Amino acid sequence: MGVAVDVETTGTAVHFGAIIELAIRPFRFDADGIITDIGPIYSWTEDPGHPLTPETVAITGLTDDDVAGRRIDEVEATRLLRSASCVVAHHSVFDRPYVERRLQGARGLDWACSFSQVDWRSRGFDGRNLGYLLQQAGYFFRPHRAAADVDALVQLLRHRADDGTTVLAELLGRMRAPSWMVYADGASFDAKDVLKARGYRWDPDRRAWWTEIADDARTAEEFWLATTVYAAGCGARAMAPRFEMVTAADRFL
């Protein structure tokens, strides 16, 4: 069984924001990644302990009256999450830290991300925004409410490519495969453009450019970094990049 998850929050930074809406919808799927049954929606709002900002109200559609005195059912939400073999969100790098901070009993589960782990272009889609993907698939929904986003996600997971494979099947394959987080520690300032062009992003906390690559791409990435970023004359302040293996249990954190 899998669960589709979405959160609405008071901010983009997990250390400064709080969940104000959590939605979970369980679903069953077969060995081919075809969804065979969709369960009921579970949705909670939660009072963050302070008034919502106008920006939060505009983005989420939630008001102070919607969340006043409300709490997430921690026991039920944790039970649902732990009952699943995979937790799917459309932007797991955002949703997972919020969920695990709020529901500590749901830490260490296998997560997948339909935003970053699906090759949407090869499936004939432009862009990766949830609403835009759904429109291209022929559906319309009200964005920025957790329950609506979860339902939209489930519909996308059911979508089939020309060869019959579902989005969920592709996602599960990517989720189960180990990958590497690559940190270009000590890269010179002048290397930022080539790193960015290769898909690296800046992590202000680690103060390093990083990317995630498939397990079988490590050798090629090591060679590229050695010749482009860490070669003599490139100005790197470290001898080599850092590679950390990640799996579905610790990815997106």
Question: What name fits each language-model region?
Answer:
Residues 70, 147, 208:
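Residue-level "edge-of-site" marker
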Residues 108-118:
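Short, acidic/small-residue loops that bind anionic groups at enzyme active sites
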Residues 148-156:
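Acidic, divalent-metal-coordinating active-site segment for phosphoryl/phosphodiester hydrolysis
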Residues 1-109, 123-143, 234-237, 244:
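Conserved non-catalytic scaffold segment of RNase H-like nuclease domains
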Residues 78-79, 85, 96-100, 117-120, ...:
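HAD-like small-molecule phosphatases
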Residues 159-253:
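Acidic two-metal-ion nuclease catalytic site recognized across multiple nuclease folds
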